[in-house]
Amino acid sequence: MLYDIHHSAAATFDKALEEILAAVKQNSQIPLRVVIFGAPKSNDEYLKQRQQIELAYREAYPAESRPLVAYVAHAPMDATLVAEVTYWEQTPKSIEYNDDYIVIDNDYILSGGLYSDIELHTGLQADNIFKRVAEILSVEGVSPANIVRQWNYIERITDITPDGQNYQLF
């Protein structure tokens, strides 16, 4: 897998998203996953922007070749939006697209955009997401021991609530 980073310092979210999408589409490799980092001011703005990102990618790519898209509320340095894009190094023999994961050459699973209701307690969000991961692994006949890279984003990761630190709850 190859990774590329695209930045946009455009003045507005809309223009930055347009620039990121154009940069991803310019690459001759097949984009498999796009993780976009931005700085929404609230959960409501985050949800609105996430829907906007998902719509932009649905309009830009047909379902059978649409990259997985995730939006992370983490302010990028010196940019409005930053995208980490995962590309496959060579032309794969097969790619099976699902809603929140892709199977490459019947050998690799790439997931992205696994979300839970952001109004839920952090522990419940974690339970929901890990249940979905377990479902994907079960459907594909893969053991959790075969996970190579797992990357979690937890809102207010260092906050401490009466139940404990958000990171520990996750």
Language-model regions, residue ranges each:
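Short, polar/acidic, helix-capping and beta-turn segments at strand->helix junctions
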Residues: M1-F170
